[in-house]
From Swiss-Prot:
This is Acyl carrier protein. Belongs to the acyl carrier protein (ACP) family. The keyword Secreted does not apply. Residues 2-77 form the Carrier domain. One of its GO terms (biological process) is lipid A biosynthetic process.
Length: 77
């Protein structure tokens, strides 16, 4: 989990320009990290590329926090 979290954190920091300390498993992309809908779509696409997974639109709608993303990747990568 730590390796996946590290990669996800780096992508979020690079994409959203937030401080690494704000990226926690409980952090909401929109509410805590200031992402808008387009940011979330771009994050999902980048996660797909980085981890070689395909995240359906339905699944993407359920990925609201950093922890959700990490759990999804671990279960599907």
């Amino acid at each position: 989990m730590a390796e996946v979290l590290e990669k996800v954190t780096k992508i979020i920091v690079d994409r959203l320009g937030v401080e690494e300390s704000k990226v926690t498993l409980e952090a909401s992309f929109k509410e805590d990290l200031g992402a808008d809908s387009l940011d979330v779509v771009e994050l999902v696409m980048e996660l797909e590329d980085e981890f070689g997974v395909e995240i359906s639109d339905g699944d993407a709608e359920n990925i609201n926090t950093v922890g959700d993303a990490v759990k999804y990747i671990e279960a599907n990568a």
